[in-house]
């Protein structure tokens, strides 16, 4: 009869997915049906939850029985997203955050203390550098930077108080790589952890935990969403470390909203399909750009000219969607190139179905001192294109407008 509900058969829950493939996990992992038997992922908009009795409330707050307490702690929609990410990354547990930067903040603040030492790759996102240099150092955490690809440099820089190694691979925006498995061995041999920002690849192209990393962080704002709609982040790893991260997030509060979690669940359903299309377009554009006058250098691991092309082939399932290149004319040339485009969006975001273009040295890395940008390899002539899903010939035509303006 219409309007009546029935108990859902627990034996038919989609959470029984042992042994299935990546695409199946991306569509069905983490789904928990309510008694309504809905087929889609439900959104739970609530700040708090009702307890049956005072004793029930006390038991839940004490962690003696499972159940939701408060949406700063847990939310069913957010939990579904966390479980799906954990399944895709091969993690024991994942926890969602309000932004990608909140994910990095949570990892360092929960696992490091004053007097601990952290090693960071030089080629990381500008805001990540600011977070480590301007804030973590203020709390007594020592920070040093190491060239990403130089394994011997990492080994030599580890101190007795080194708590973690933090890397982006591929890096933003130069697409530099590190051998994750080899770096994990170095870290573990000296009793420290390896944290990998997997934003550029997503688990569709790379699963750092399966290569030996301890924790993975993401800006879900990028490719996990895939359409530039909302912001979020996620941390995934072993339950031992994740317990500390969860505790920090529940106390500090940079948690993900259920609406954004629902958007990310929808994004994950098409993640693998989208990443294949992104990679195909990016490969075509990188090869085309490498042949053009006015282009001094193209940074894309899918090119045979890239010094880490073989590592990318071995470590990743695709070369990613971000193509960076250096043009003649320095900053003025880069700005003329960008301003001449008509189809591509001038915006600092990436991972969108719409192709975006930006000038890193005056946007994402603009707050860094000139010497910091130089150390990170961010030159004034550098342009970053996050390749979307448009017809590649239209993208080539738009970039040709930029070339004509040089």
Which residues are covered by each model-predicted region?
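Acidic-histidine catalytic/liganding microenvironments
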Residues: 88, 289-293, 341
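Conserved C-terminal alpha-helix-loop-beta "cap" of PLP-dependent enzymes
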Residues: 297-383, 387
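N-terminal "arm"/small-domain region of PLP-dependent enzymes with the aminotransferase-like
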Residues: 2-75, 83
């Amino acid at each position: 009869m219409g309007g009546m509900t029935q108990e859902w058969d627990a034996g038919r829950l989609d959470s029984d997915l042992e042994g299935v493939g990546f695409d199946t996990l991306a569509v069905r992992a983490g789904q928990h049906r309510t008694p309504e038997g809905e087929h889609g992922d439900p959104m739970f908009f609530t700040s708090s939850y009702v307890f049956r009795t005072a004793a029930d409330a006390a038991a839940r707050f004490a962690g003696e029985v499972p159940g939701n307490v408060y949406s700063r702690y847990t939310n069913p929609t957010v939990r579904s997203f966390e479980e799906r990410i954990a399944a895709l990354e091969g993690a024991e547990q994942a926890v969602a955050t309000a932004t990608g930067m909140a994910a990095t903040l949570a990892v360092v603040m929960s696992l490091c203390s004053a007097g601990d030492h952290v090693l960071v790759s030089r080629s990381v996102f500008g805001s990540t550098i600011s977070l480590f240099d301007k804030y973590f150092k203020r709390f007594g955490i020592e920070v040093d930077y190491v060239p990403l690809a130089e394994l011997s440099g990492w080994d030599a820089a580890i101190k007795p108080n080194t708590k973690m190694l933090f890397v982006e691979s591929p890096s933003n925006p130069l697409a530099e790589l590190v051998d994750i498995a080899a770096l994990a061995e170095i870290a573990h041999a000296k009793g420290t952890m390896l944290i990998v920002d997997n934003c550029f690849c997503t688990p569709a192209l790379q699963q750092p935990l399966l290569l030996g990393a301890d924790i993975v962080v993401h800006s879900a704002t990028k490719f996990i969403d895939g359409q530039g709609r909302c912001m979020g982040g996620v941390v995934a790893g072993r339950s031992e470390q994740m317990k500390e991260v969860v505790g920090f997030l529940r106390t500090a509060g940079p948690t993900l909203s259920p609406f954004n979690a629902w958007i990310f669940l929808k994004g994950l359903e098409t993640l693998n399909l989208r990443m294949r299309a992104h990679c195909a377009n990016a490969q075509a554009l990188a090869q085309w750009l490498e042949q053009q006058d006015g282009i001094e250098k193209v940074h894309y691991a899918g090119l045979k000219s890239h010094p880490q092309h073989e590592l990318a082939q071995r470590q990743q399932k695709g070369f990613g969607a971000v193509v960076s290149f250096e043009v003649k004319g320095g900053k003025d040339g880069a700005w003329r190139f960008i301003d001449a485009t008509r189809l591509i969006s001038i915006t600092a975001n990436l991972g969108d179905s719409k192709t975006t273009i930006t000038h890193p040295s005056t946007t994402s890395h603009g707050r860094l001192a000139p010497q910091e940008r130089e150390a990170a390899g961010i030159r004034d002539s550098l342009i970053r294109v996050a390749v979307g899903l448009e017809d590649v010939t239209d993208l080539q035509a738009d970039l040709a407008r930029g070339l004509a303006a040089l």
